[in-house]
């Protein structure tokens, strides 16, 4: 325990409920022979009276929440008058001790190799501990009730080699979102291994599968999860539209720059405003965007097609949504913009799967796949020391798997 000059620990109580420890309450009292100090000048002063008992959160002991209890004294300082005494474990009126605030702040930024240093052990010991923790969780996790999964690929490492991609399978039910499986490469064989790892009972019980338009995934899902409603992720479609608009902008910018620098200025600093949703563009970017839309440039027509397509997701009827999709593809094919025509051909080729999004509305967590992908990117950025797939796999399960944990009396974070 931490020692504080002028104070002693009087009593320690363990509060239990239903046979389990709930909290540790430590009563603190002032030392009998030492005066309290003014909280402003820190000089000793005679006592005046006592305030009601307060409670501060301290560093947990053995995984049990720990609190200090103390009734602060007021002292009569010659310079500052009657004032609350200086409390060495506290800062102002905060209900958390300074030790606990430092503890939380350090753990909030701590990485795995720093954990090894903090507990005076090796990186290998930390890694093996996490590996055991993940293996225990995978062996004891329950997969009953999984009805919706998302399948996606994630780029990992440097370069675009096949080994630098991961295939991930998520549970995306509204009630639960977690990582179920991760494998190396983005091939049919990889996805087959992932579905096999889930087990035949889980695969047969699936009602919805969400994926992008990667052909190997589409083929495996159709062959092995045919009973489930296959939905194409709307965020991947939006990404294709944004890429098409950016291709039109870059091609037109090159063409205008060849004519004159002044003409090319019309598209300068417009990349990100063009890729954002129109309703979210504000200020000077909005003014430049409005000036562009008033022109007859190809980029303005491409942006208009992209914004028009956003209305597609607002439909509730599959029939009306299908009619809008046909109308939009008709416009795109006659826009004389090859990137937009390419998107239109892609949407027509996958129209049944795109319309399944409306049939599954409310049944799966929309945007869950992209949200979990973002969390994976956070883990990869934070884990610069993970240079092998095995270490990366352990890190992803540990952070996103929502795995059960073995019982332990020591839970510090």
Language model feature labels by segment:
Residues 30-35, 70-73:
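Short metal-coordination and nucleic-acid-contact micro-motifs, chiefly zinc-binding Cys/His arrays
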Residues 42-46, 51-149, 153-160, 203-204:
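Short, positively charged, Gly/Tyr-enriched micro-motifs
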Residues 84-87, 175-181, 355-356:
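Short small-residue beta-strand/loop micro-motif enriched in glycine and branched aliphatics
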Residues 1-25, 30-32, 99, 120-139, ...:
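Long C-terminal interaction/binding lobes of large macromolecular proteins
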Residues 87-91, 204, 228, 252-257:
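Short, polar/flexible loop-turn hinges at active-site or ligand-entry regions and domain interfaces
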Residues 165-166, 242-254:
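Short, surface-exposed amphipathic charged segments that create phosphate/polyanion-binding patches used
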Residues 35, 40, 46, 160-163, ...:
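Acidic/histidine-rich catalytic cores and adjacent linkers
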């Amino acid at each position: 325990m931490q020692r504080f000059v002028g104070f002693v620990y009087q009593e320690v109580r363990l509060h239990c409920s239903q046979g389990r420890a709930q909290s540790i309450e430590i009563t603190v009292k002032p030392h009998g022979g030492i005066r309290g100090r003014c909280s402003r000048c820190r000089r000793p002063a005679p006592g005046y009276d006592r305030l009601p008992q307060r409670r501060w959160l301290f560093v947990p002991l053995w995984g049990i929440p720990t609190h200090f209890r103390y009734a602060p004294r007021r002292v009569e300082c010659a310079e500052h008058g009657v004032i609350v005494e200086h409390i060495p474990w506290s800062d102002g009126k905060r209900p958390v001790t300074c030790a606990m605030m430092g503890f939380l702040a350090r753990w909030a930024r701590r990485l795995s190799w720093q954990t090894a240093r903090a507990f005076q052990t090796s990186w290998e010991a930390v890694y093996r501990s996490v590996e055991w923790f993940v293996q225990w969780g995978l062996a004891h996790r329950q997969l009953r009730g999984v009805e919706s999964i998302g399948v996606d690929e994630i780029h990992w490492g440097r370069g675009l080699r096949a080994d630098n991609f991961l295939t991930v399978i998520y549970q995306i039910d509204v009630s639960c979102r977690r990582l179920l499986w991760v494998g190396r490469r983005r091939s049919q064989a990889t996805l087959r291994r992932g579905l096999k790892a889930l087990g035949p009972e889980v695969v047969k019980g699936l009602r919805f599968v969400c994926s992008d338009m990667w052909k190997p995934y589409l083929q495996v899902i159709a062959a092995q999860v045919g009973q489930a409603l296959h939905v194409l992720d709307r965020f991947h479609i939006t990404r294709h539209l944004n890429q098409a608009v950016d291709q039109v902008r870059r091609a037109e910018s090159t063409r205008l720059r060849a004519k004159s620098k002044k003409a090319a200025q019309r598209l300068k600093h417009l990349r990100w405003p063009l890729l954002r949703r129109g309703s979210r563009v504000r200020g000077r970017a909005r003014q430049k965007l409005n000036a562009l839309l008033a022109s007859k440039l190809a980029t303005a027509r491409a942006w208009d097609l992209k914004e028009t397509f956003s209305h597609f997701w607002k439909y509730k009827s599959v029939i009306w949504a299908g009619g809008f999709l046909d109308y939009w593809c008709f416009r795109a094919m006659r826009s004389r913009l090859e990137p937009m025509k390419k998107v239109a051909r892609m949407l027509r080729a996958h129209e049944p799967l795109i319309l399944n999004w409306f049939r599954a509305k409310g049944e799966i967590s929309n945007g869950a796949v992209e949200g979990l992908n973002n969390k994976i990117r956070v883990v990869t950025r934070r884990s610069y020391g993970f240079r092998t797939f095995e270490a990366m796999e352990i890190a992803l399960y540990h952070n996103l798997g929502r795995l059960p944990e073995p019982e332990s009396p020591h839970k510090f974070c």
